[in-house]
């Protein structure tokens, strides 16, 4: 798409080889190249919305990462953090690994995220990724008023 901030097809192909996702083939990962949600990133187990993101003081092309969706519970995902495009594979591995470590038997990723709260789950991911992960959504930038 000409509006894409990131190249979602490239990201999707890279993630197709992710070992953590291969171990958990029932997980649904939806990748949108921008916030317009053509791939409906809010309803994937892991949703990725292409965006300019700030991570560790650097602004770059990357993804706002959604988690917590569970269609059985009528829940959509929320932004749990931000990651640069080059660290996307590591972030998905950390998300899945965190879920594997924290989940109860048979518990979906969405239910695990909600049980820990999105903020608490994000802190677990940050512990794994250190300065390659920024918790929460991209901070809003106040508009500049010109007189």
Residue ranges, per PLM feature:
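Small-residue-enriched alpha-helical segments and adjacent helix-cap loops
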Residues: 1-58, 63
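Conserved active-site and cofactor/substrate-binding residues in soluble primary-metabolism enzymes
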Residues: 6, 10, 83-90, 107
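Alpha-helix initiation and N-capping motif
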Residues: 12, 92, 106-109, 118, ...
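Short secondary-structure junctions and interdomain/linker hinges
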Residues: 22, 99-106, 120-123, 132, ...
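Flexible, glycine/charged-enriched surface loops at secondary-structure junctions
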Residues: 23-28, 102-114
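Short, internal active-site loops enriched in acidic
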Residues: 35-37, 116-119
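Mobile "lid/hinge" segments at catalytic clefts and subdomain interfaces of large enzymes
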Residues: 42-102
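Intrinsic disorder at enzyme termini
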Residues: 124-147
């Amino acid at each position: 798409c000409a509006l894409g901030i990131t190249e979602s097809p490239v990201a999707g192909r890279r993630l197709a080889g992710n070992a953590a996702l291969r171990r958990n083939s029932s997980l649904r990962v939806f990748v949108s190249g921008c916030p317009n949600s053509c791939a409906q990133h809010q309803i994937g187990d892991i949703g990725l919305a292409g965006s300019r993101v700030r991570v560790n003081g650097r602004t770059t092309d990357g993804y706002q990462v959604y988690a917590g969706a569970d269609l059985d519970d009528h829940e959509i995902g929320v932004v749990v953090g931000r990651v640069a495009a080059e660290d996307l594979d590591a972030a998905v591995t950390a998300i899945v690994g965190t879920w594997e470590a924290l989940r109860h038997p048979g518990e979906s990723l969405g239910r695990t995220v909600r049980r820990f709260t999105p903020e608490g789950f994000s802190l677990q991911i940050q512990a794994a990724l250190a300065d390659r992960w920024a918790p929460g959504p991209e901070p809003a930038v106040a508009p500049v008023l010109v007189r």
